[in-house]
């Protein structure tokens, strides 16, 4: 290709990408400036506009950089996260004052008892702090995010557990004859961490500090995705005429209770019981809010003790497991359900058949580390059928990858 042709192609590509970026930015700005009613549809429209803007920004940056520089960004991105993880461990984020005041690396290094030259290099190359003078830094909103406990935990978990698995993924897949990993004990994570045949869950259970990072980080996900509970018309359960002894909802693997508390608030006029189930160490710290909510230690690989509930829920759990394990979990629920009375609600990402978004993509690679996966609707229907279920309704906002599957016994 001639130089002039290459230049013209680049100019055309970057102009078109800029137009798409400006359009996405205008739509996002319009959503931000409009009045909001707090509905699920409103929330989803805001999120979709934001996601589209981010995606177009990524595309624009890729075109602006060109193919070779885009490949080279792997050095830049890994350097940034390496700096951030080191600064987190060092305690540098807490060492800077909040409120816009800057501080020298000399003062900060003395407080932290670290080498100033090392600290200065890490802060300079982290792309997080504002440089106000030679070796003078202050917080930005991006660095202050690391002061939030749930953000710190999520980042630590990503870097310490999944980054090694990502970097060793090609080695594992080659040793696995380039086939999809489907085992909890033989996957990129167990390979990278040399777990000696233990799954990530078993391995982390022996390392409480690292398991705590996972649990604390998941509270962020639980808070940001609570809105999916709102997709189901909870008031419709009154049609089944529950009594004070009826179990209205069982939240299986429901964590600390935010989900079941929200469900109870939507069913405030209904009598009956609401059950929060999770492993014993999680249930101990659970604090659900609402009348009639009971806590129960339970492992979903065991027989489900609550029989004939109106609604069972499994929220954001099944994607962590390979198909064989999912079928076992689902069959335990199925055995407890009463035909044409009990339903199971499954809250998960539903990967679109085409043009999957950023979140679905990186989440699927996280799951590959564990021998699990994110699934399309067809794939969910297939695995559910193997456990004796059929999908009767899908609750999903257009443009959003998260959905709620309402499934019944076949």
Swiss-Prot record:
Cysteine pairings via disulfide bonds: none
Binding site for S-adenosyl-L-methionine: 253-254, 278, 299-300, 315
Top EC class of this enzyme: transferase
Keyword ATP-binding set for record: no
Induction, per UniProt: Expression is induced by the developmental and secondary metabolism regulator veA.
Residue numbers annotated as active site: 319 (proton acceptor)
Pfam families for this protein: Methyltransf_2 (PF00891)
Pathway linked to the protein: Secondary metabolite biosynthesis
Protein purpose: O-methyltransferase; part of the gene cluster that mediates the biosynthesis of aflavarin, a bicoumarin that exhibits anti-insectan activity against the fungivorous beetle C.hemipterus.
Similarity comment: family membership: Belongs to the class I-like SAM-binding methyltransferase superfamily. Cation-independent O-methyltransferase family. COMT subfamily.
Name of the molecule in the record: O-methyltransferase afvC
Organism whose genome encodes this protein: Aspergillus flavus (strain ATCC 200026 / FGSC A1120 / IAM 13836 / NRRL 3357 / JCM 12722 / SRRC 167)
């Amino acid at each position: 290709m001639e130089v002039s042709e290459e230049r013209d192609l680049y100019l055309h590509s970057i102009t078109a990408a800029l137009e798409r970026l400006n359009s996405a930015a205008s739509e996002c700005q319009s959503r931000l400036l409009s009045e909001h009613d707090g509905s699920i549809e409103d929330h989803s429209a805001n999120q979709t506009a934001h996601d589209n803007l981010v995606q177009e920004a990524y595309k624009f940056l890729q075109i602006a950089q060109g193919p070779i520089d885009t490949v080279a960004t792997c050095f830049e991105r890994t350097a940034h996260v390496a700096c951030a993880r080191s600064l987190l461990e060092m305690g540098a984020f807490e060492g800077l004052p909040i409120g816009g005041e800057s501080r020298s690396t000399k003062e900060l290094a003395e407080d932290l008892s670290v080498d100033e030259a090392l600290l200065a290099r890490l802060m300079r190359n982290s792309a997080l702090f504002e440089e106000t003078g030679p070796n003078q830094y202050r917080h930005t909103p991006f660095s202050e995010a690391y002061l939030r406990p749930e953000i710190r935990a999520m980042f630590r978990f990503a870097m310490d557990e999944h980054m090694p698995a990502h970097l060793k993924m090609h080695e594992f897949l080659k040793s696995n004859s380039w086939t999809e990993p489907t085992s909890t004990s033989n996957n990129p994570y167990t390979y990278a961490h040399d777990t000696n045949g233990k799954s990530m869950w078993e391995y982390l259970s022996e390392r409480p500090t690292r398991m705590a990072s996972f649990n604390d980080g998941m509270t962020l996900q639980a808070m940001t995705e609570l809105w999916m509970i709102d997709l189901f018309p909870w008031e419709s359960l009154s049609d089944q005429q529950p009594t004070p002894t009826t179990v209205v909802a069982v939240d299986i693997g429901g964590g600390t209770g935010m989900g079941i508390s929200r469900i109870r608030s939507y069913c405030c006029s209904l009598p009956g019981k609401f059950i929060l189930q999770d492993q014993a160490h999680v249930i101990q710290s659970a604090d659900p809010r609402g009348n009639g909510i009971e806590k129960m230690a339970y492992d979903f690989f065991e027989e489900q003790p609550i029989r004939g509930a109106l609604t069972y829920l499994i929220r954001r759990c099944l994607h962590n497991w390979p198909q064989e394990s999912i079928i076992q979990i689902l069959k335990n629920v199925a055995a407890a359900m009463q035909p044409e009375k009990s339903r199971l609600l499954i809250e998960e990402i539903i990967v679109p058949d085409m043009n999957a978004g950023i979140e679905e993509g990186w989440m699927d690679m996280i799951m590959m580390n564990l021998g699990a996966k994110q699934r399309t609707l067809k794939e969910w229907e297939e695995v559910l059928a193997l456990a004796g279920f059929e999908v009767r309704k899908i609750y999903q906002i257009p443009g959003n990858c998260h959905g709620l599957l309402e499934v019944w016994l076949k």
